[in-house]
């Protein structure tokens, strides 16, 4: 974990969180990172963070708050970059096997899923890749229970409506229903 409390670069872990940072994993903090924040006093809903060997997660700019019930997994040699200055509500799931970039001022509602891979499932199609980078630019709003799939590029200011599934290119300042 790379941070500096005196410079405001720290990691706050709340009760009922499981953190696994394997050998050579990196958690780089350029701002405060709050993990597993609870709104309901006494809740035991756990949050999980796994960064496998060679994986890297970086909070780039302003503070980032992840509410309880989160599951963030950064696989071997994968990169997860979060711009900061906002956060995610309860139930965030991020599965990163390649590269996921989330821009500044991007908010996630309840039960949002972001993934850049399909779980290593074998599909017999020439040229098929099991993962593809995801880019979510700044000032994006991912609303309740939406899913961002491998290869998605979401331009600035877009809003992804509740229970939408997104793949491919989403233009700036658009609303996906």
Give the positions of each predicted feature.
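Domain-scale signature associated with acetyltransferase and cell-envelope carbohydrate enzymes
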Residues: 1-115, 133, 137-139, 146-148, ...
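Flexible, solvent-exposed loop segments that connect beta-strands
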Residues: 123-128
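A generic "structured core" feature
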Residues: 137, 159-161, 165
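Extracellular carbohydrate recognition
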Residues: 152
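Short-chain dehydrogenase/reductase
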Residues: 159, 175-177
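Short helix N-cap motif at coil->helix boundaries in the Bergerat
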Residues: 168
């Amino acid at each position: 974990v790379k941070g500096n409390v005196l410079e405001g670069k720290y990691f706050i872990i709340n009760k009922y969180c499981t953190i696994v940072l394997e050998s050579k994993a990196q958690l780089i903090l350029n701002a405060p990172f709050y993990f597993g924040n609870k709104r309901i006093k006494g809740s035991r809903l756990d949050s999980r963070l796994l960064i496998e060997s060679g994986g890297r997660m970086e909070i780039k700019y302003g503070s980032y708050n992840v509410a309880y019930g989160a599951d963030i997994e950064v696989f071997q040699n994968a990169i997860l970059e979060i711009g900061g200055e906002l956060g995610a509500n309860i139930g965030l799931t991020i599965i990163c096997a390649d590269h996921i970039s989330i821009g500044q001022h991007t908010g996630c509602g309840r039960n949002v899923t972001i993934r850049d891979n399909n779980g290593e499932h074998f599909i017999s199609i020439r040229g098929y890749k099991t993962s593809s980078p995801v880019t979510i630019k700044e000032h994006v709003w991912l609303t309740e229970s939406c899913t961002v799939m491998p290869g998605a590029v979401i331009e600035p200011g877009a809003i992804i409506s509740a229970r939408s599934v997104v793949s491919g290119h989403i233009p700036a300042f658009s609303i996906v229903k």
